[in-house]
Swiss-Prot record:
Protein name: Protein distal antenna
Family matches, as Pfam families: CENP-B_N
Biased composition (Acidic residues): 513-528
One Gene Ontology term, aspect cellular component: nucleus
Biased composition (Pro residues): 369-384
Residue ranges for the DNA-binding region feature of this UniProt entry: 32-52
Biased composition (Polar residues): 499-508
Subcellular location: Nucleus
Compositional bias segments (type: Low complexity): 339-368, 479-493, 559-579
Protein keywords: Developmental protein, DNA-binding, Nucleus, Phosphoprotein, Transcription, Transcription regulation
Domain HTH psq-type: 5-56
Organism: Aedes aegypti
MF-aspect GO terms: DNA binding; DNA-binding transcription factor activity
Gene that this polypeptide is encoded by: dan
Length: 675
């Protein structure tokens, strides 16, 4: 150790190799302070060495002392060969390397420029291409790894692209196989990893597996043929992708030229979707039976060469999806649903027959298919094979096609395929059972309850006159007196469960109740008078209720139900007491004349029967229970909820009025006591 003057730090003369050893100790995990204390230099100096590590490594290799030291170590054989090459190659070779070392504006890594030449013979990886010789001292080897200065190789590549001479180069994605060009970032890593060929990637995955998986994903994303997934089209497609270096044949020249036309003169930006499009476009030029089987290759050969890169309009149904559907049907026991694979009869057919198309879709539009209502479409016979046309395949997804064919067979009424009349009857009955469907389509036959200003009058005002004339309540929303489609029949007391009236059930119940009522008393001669009075009463009530709303109690739906119960016209009552009214008719025949002369004063008297808001709320709660048990398709759940909120608000106001009355009474008593 050399000591300087007093007061200065002790200085040591360290070689570049010693500095590199110190830096390596830091890389191995030691702290800079401990290393600096060990070698006797300040920590700031060691920190400066770490910043100039690349330069120090280059200087250590240049020194003769380092070369002599490395000759004694068996693990540094590569560095010895490099030092010997530098010592014995002569000045021109050294000047060439120094000039090339300045490439990149001084940012070139010394390690890369120095180690590029010996890595070839050590690892057996040819980085120079097919037309260059491998030599340790050649400057072309160094520049070949950098891909930047030698423009003559670029012109050679452009010439080779036109004639298809060399397709086996690893690092050039323009000339490699399509599957390997799709993963060109991974293939370029093979030069850095030092592994030979494409057998293993730095990601610990086989390049063949990556190429195969990427091809399958490309075909899946592009809605391409998935025969390789289902093994229906053979494994030839996957096997062709596993070949990293395919043999040169006559089909390589047009394939390479098409690829250059698509990508232009620049480097190709190949993605997974572009790969699938290129394979779909150029699959007709491959050898027979190479991709997707013989049938698909014939179909692609019929395409024009200038076809767009999008989806083919005449593409058949995906075979893998067909295989998946068959497996699903096998699990469900529906193997006879399809008799043959749905594909168009001819690939070039422009339009499909309308008869076959109407088996799948029951509307004429093929461009915008709307979801069918569950109860309306005709069921498809299981034995018939539906035809999926090219327009269907192009304009709608495969799952929608599967739903239209497979879901139609699971619809209600599947057992009535032999009789069209029974199927129509079942569909109508199911339409009445579906409340949502009846709500959506009830405006076709009669006006909607929401369009008229009469929300609750449907079940309140029943048939005028004696109870034994008609068993159905009148629908005030329909002014044509035809309420058979919209009104509900009151259920008997034995079964309080909800039921949905269909045309058949309502007709049967109507006939049955008419027979019972005819036994109770004859009233056939009064039906004209009853209909006449019915119209008058309805008009009077309309004018009174919806043109003169004088009070909240008079306009509330709860009070309307009470008026109907207090009036002699009591047909629409709760299911629990409807049987009582049918079996015990009251003598109301003498009141017909009085009812025909009813006026607004009498209506005021009817509403005046309700003494207070609390009584109205009580009757409203009874009517709400009846509404919840009612199964009329014209009464929606939203209307019931609105009536609940209305009744609740009336109840709160009634309680508030009652509290105010009680408080006012207490104040009066207090005032009296004070007096």
């Amino acid at each position: 150790m050399m000591m300087a003057t007093k007061g200065k730090r002790p200085l040591r003369h360290l070689t570049a190799t010693d500095k590199i050893d110190a830096i390596q100790r830091i890389h191995d995990g030691e702290s800079k302070a401990s290393v600096a204390r060990d070698i006797g230099v300040p920590e700031s100096t060691l920190r400066g060495w770490c910043k100039n590590e690349e330069k120090l490594r280059y200087m250590s290799r240049q020194s003769a002392e380092n070369a002599e030291k490395l000759t004694n170590e068996a693990t540094a054989a590569a560095l010895t060969a490099v030092a010997a090459a530098e010592l014995f190659n002569g000045p021109p070779e050294k000047r060439l390397k120094l000039e090339q070392g300045l490439f990149g504006n001084g940012k070139l890594k010394y390690d890369d420029s120095f180690y590029k030449s010996p890595r070839g013979p050590m690892n057996g990886l040819d980085l120079s291409g097919g037309d260059k010789g491998l030599g340790v001292s050649g400057g072309d080897i160094i520049m070949n790894g950098l891909h930047g200065a030698d423009f003559s190789s670029k012109s050679k590549e452009m010439n080779l692209k036109g004639y298809g001479a060399d397709l086996s180069k690893h690092g050039d994605p323009k000339q490699a196989d399509l599957s390997m060009a799709a993963i060109s970032p991974l293939t370029s890593l093979s030069h850095l990893s030092g592994m030979s060929g494409l057998a293993q990637s730095p990601l610990a995955l086989s390049f063949n597996e990556i190429a195969t998986n990427l091809n399958l994903f490309a075909q899946l994303n592009n809605n391409h043929n998935l025969a390789t997934m289902s093994n229906l089209g053979g494994l030839s497609a996957a096997q062709s992708l596993r070949n990293a270096r395919p043999k040169a044949n006559t089909s390589q020249s047009p394939r390479t030229s098409n690829l250059s036309d698509v990508n232009g003169d620049k480097n190709p930006s190949l993605t997974v979707r572009n790969l699938a499009k290129l394979q779909q476009k150029n699959s007709g030029d491959l050898s027979n039976g190479m991709m997707h089987g013989i049938n698909l290759s014939d179909k692609y050969k019929q395409q024009p060469s200038a076809a767009p890169l999008g989806r083919d309009t005449n593409a058949p149904v995906d075979e893998a999806l067909w295989y998946w559907l068959k497996s699903q049907q096998a699990m469900l026991g529906l193997n006879n649903l399809y008799s043959s694979m749905p594909r168009p009869s001819s690939p070039q057919q422009s339009s499909s027959p309308p008869q076959q198309h109407q088996q799948v879709q029951h509307h004429p539009s093929t461009q915008t298919p709307t979801p069918p209502i569950v109860s309306t479409p005709q069921p498809t016979p299981p034995s018939s094979a539906p035809s999926l046309t090219p327009e269907d395949t192009k304009n709608s997804s495969w799952f929608w096609q599967w739903y239209k064919t497979f879901g139609a067979s699971l619809m209600p009424g599947d057992k009535s395929n032999n009789n069209t009349i029974n199927a129509n009857a079942n569909s109508k009955q199911a339409a009445y059972e579906n409340i949502l469907y009846s709500q959506l389509t009830k405006g076709q036959n009669s006006d909607s309850l929401n369009n008229n200003a009469q929300p609750i009058n449907l079940n309140i005002i029943s048939s005028n006159g004696p109870e034994n004339v008609k068993s159905e309540p009148e629908d005030l929303s329909n002014h044509n007196h035809s309420s058979s489609n919209a009104a509900a029949v009151a259920a008997p007391a034995e079964d309080l469960q909800r039921f949905n009236p269909s045309p058949s059930t309502s007709a049967k119940s109507e006939l049955k109740q008419e027979d019972d009522e005819e036994q109770a008393g004859p009233a056939d001669d009064e039906s004209p008078m009853e209909s006449k009075c019915n119209g008058k009463v309805k008009d009077v009530l309309d004018n009174f209720l919806f043109q003169n709303p004088s009070s909240n109690d008079r306009a509330s739906p709860a009070n309307l139900s009470i008026r109907s119960n207090n009036s002699p016209r009591r047909r629409s009552v709760s299911p629990a007491v409807s049987n009582h009214h049918v079996n015990s008719p009251e003598p109301e025949n003498g009141d017909l004349a009085h009812k025909s002369d009813i006026s607004e004063d009498s209506n005021h008297m009817l509403v005046a029967d309700i003494k207070s808001s609390a009584e109205a709320v009580e009757h409203g709660e009874k009517f709400l229970k009846w509404l919840e048990a009612c199964s009329d398709p014209n009464v929606t759940a939203m209307q019931v909820m609105q009536f609940k909120y209305l009744l609740n608000s009336i109840k709160l106001s009634a309680e508030r009025q009652q509290q105010n009355a009680v408080s006012s009474g207490e104040e009066r008593t207090r005032v009296r006591r004070r007096k």
